[in-house]
């Protein structure tokens, strides 16, 4: 019987042990590398996810704004066939509004507002001008549309309703019915839907001249929930800068039926009444932005220029 080579056996055992240890160490290293790679991948994924989420959040914040400051301005150059008030009053060319300064709202600043909710801020068809702050809340801006409009919310030459077909001291029943609807302008906002109608002096009565002198109380008027805008008031117009007032020269003027309306309704009553039906104020053209009283008969018509009220937090200015 052969004796075991103890020395050789011992060496073999050591070698096997070293190999086993090496394999274990390599396994641990590989496991660590895999874990490290997974951890790195997870970290990268987490950072990318957070970054993308932040970017998307910022995009949503920006796109959720109702109005953005305009980058270009509307202008008009008169020709021999021009029929707007500015041109028929002897004008040659005009630029409407101003681009303004970042972080500051100035009367006449131009904005593009996504009132129809399609995600686009169309400078041609969704142009508005800042007028002033809402009297009851300085955190809300009052903006006026660039042109006359009808219920569909688009530029309209033919929309020219009476203020109120029966009398002018009961509120803008007929004029308000021709304002853009909430279906046409779903993103437009009004925070002052119900308010007192005043005369030009801030009073709440008018004098009607009949066979005797009669005093009529002006109503607290509520615009229908189906309309997305309101009419401008005499006081708001008087607070506008010349640049802002000149925006009303767009698409106003002429007395021919195919011309643009020669006046734009304001929701302010004439204190002295103006006959048995009463009268309200209107922006009159072609004598530029002159204020006049209308109507001479209840059915006399003017254009409507929609006004919206937008929280300043909903405006990118």
Task: List where the protein language model places each region.
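N-terminal leader/signal peptides at the extreme start of proteins
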Residues: 1-9
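N-terminal single-pass transmembrane signal-anchor helix
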Residues: 9-31
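Aliphatic-rich helix starts adjacent to a transmembrane/signal segment
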Residues: 31-51
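Hydrophobic/aromatic hotspots within intrinsically disordered, low-complexity regions
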Residues: 43-45, 60, 73
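N-terminal low-complexity, intrinsically disordered "leader/linker" segments enriched in small/polar
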Residues: 47-65
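Collagenous Gly-X-Y triple-helix signature in extracellular proteins
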Residues: 63-317
């Amino acid at each position: 019987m052969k004796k075991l080579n103890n020395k050789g056996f011992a060496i073999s055992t050591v070698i096997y042990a070293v190999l086993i240890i090496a394999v274990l160490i390599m396994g641990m290293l590989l496991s660590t590398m895999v874990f490290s790679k997974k951890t790195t991948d997870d970290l990268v994924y987490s950072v990318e996810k957070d970054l993308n989420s932040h970017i998307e959040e910022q995009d949503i914040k920006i796109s959720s704004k109702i109005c953005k400051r305009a980058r270009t301005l509307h202008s008009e150059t008169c020709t021999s066939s021009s029929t707007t008030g500015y041109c028929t009053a002897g004008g040659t060319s005009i630029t409407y509004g101003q681009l303004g300064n970042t972080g500051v709202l100035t009367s006449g600043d131009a904005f593009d507002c996504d009132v129809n909710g399609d995600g686009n801020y169309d400078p041609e068809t969704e142009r508005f001008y800042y007028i002033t702050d809402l009297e009851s809340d300085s955190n809300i801006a009052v903006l006026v549309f660039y042109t006359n409009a009808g219920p569909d919310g688009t530029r309209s030459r033919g929309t020219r309703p009476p203020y109120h077909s029966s009398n002018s001291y009961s509120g803008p029943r007929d004029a308000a019915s021709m304002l853009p609807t909430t279906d046409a302008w779903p993103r437009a906002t009004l925070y002052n839907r119900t308010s007192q109608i005043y005369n030009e002096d801030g009073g709440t009565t008018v004098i009607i001249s009949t066979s005797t002198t009669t005093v009529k109380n002006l109503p607290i008027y509520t615009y229908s929930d189906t309309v997305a805008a309101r009419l401008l008031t005499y006081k708001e117009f008087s607070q506008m800068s010349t640049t802002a007032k000149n925006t009303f020269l767009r698409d106003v003027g002429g007395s021919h039926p195919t011309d643009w309306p020669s006046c734009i309704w304001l929701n302010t009553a004439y204190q002295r009444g103006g006959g048995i039906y009463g009268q309200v104020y209107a922006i009159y053209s072609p004598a530029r932005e002159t204020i006049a009283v209308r109507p001479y008969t209840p059915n006399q018509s003017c254009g409507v220029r929609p006004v919206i009220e937008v929280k300043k937090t909903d405006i990118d200015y």
